[in-house]
Design a protein with these regions (language model features):
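A short acidic Gly-Thr/Ser loop motif
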Residues: 17-18
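FAD-binding FR-type
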Residues: 1-14, 27-30, 48, 75-76, ...
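Histidine-anchored nucleotide/phosphate-binding helix
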Residues: 21-33
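Reductase modules of NAD(P)H-dependent flavoproteins
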Residues: 39-142
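A broad, low-specificity signal for short, low-complexity segments enriched in glycine/proline
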Residues: 30-35, 63-65
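Short, flexible hinge/linker loops that cap or flank conserved catalytic cores
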Residues: 5-8, 34-36, 97
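Short, flexible helix/strand-to-coil boundary loops that buttress conserved ligand/catalytic motifs
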Residues: 6, 25-28, 91, 116
Length: 142
């Protein structure tokens, strides 16, 4: 997947909603096995904390690798003390300069396109995101 992105070394955002984490996990594990020094920000969103079915894994990555950062984002659980809201809200609040970032976005078509649009509105370059959604559910531009 990453070979489809422009050859740059800015921060990589692995953005996953729900079970989309399985794809982000595979990419993260591959990068870590290669010994990447590139900053990697893993954002995993779910409606409730139970949707983060293996949150201990990306937490461990961030403890073991100083270049890896993990943020869990919960949208529908008021007693959650971490980041709340939608994934793109957390991303635009956290990342000062989205123009230097690249992203892999894993989730439903609505989530992927909403995230892309919000990030572009904050300086992200559209051609710096890859997602299977762009192939399986292309946006109707008419």
């Amino acid at each position: 997947h990453l070979d489809k992105l422009p050859k740059e070394e800015g921060p990589l955002l692995l953005i996953a909603a729900g079970t989309g984490f399985s794809q982000a996990k595979a990419i993260a594990e591959d990068l870590l096995n290669q010994g990447t020094s590139r900053p990697v920000h893993v954002y995993w969103g779910a409606r409730t904390v139970t949707g983060l079915y293996m949150a201990d894994l990306p937490e461990q990555w961030s403890e073991d690798h100083e270049n890896v950062h993990f943020s869990a984002v919960i949208s529908e659980q008021n007693d959650w003390e971490g980041k709340q809201g939608l994934l793109y809200q957390a991303i635009v609040a956290d990342i000062d300069d989205l123009s230097i970032c690249q992203a892999v976005c894993c989730g439903s078509p609505n989530m992927v396109y909403a995230t892309l649009d919000a990030m572009v509105d904050h300086g992200f370059r559209q051609d710096h995101m890859i997602s299977d959604v762009f192939t399986i559910a292309p946006r109707d531009e008419s």
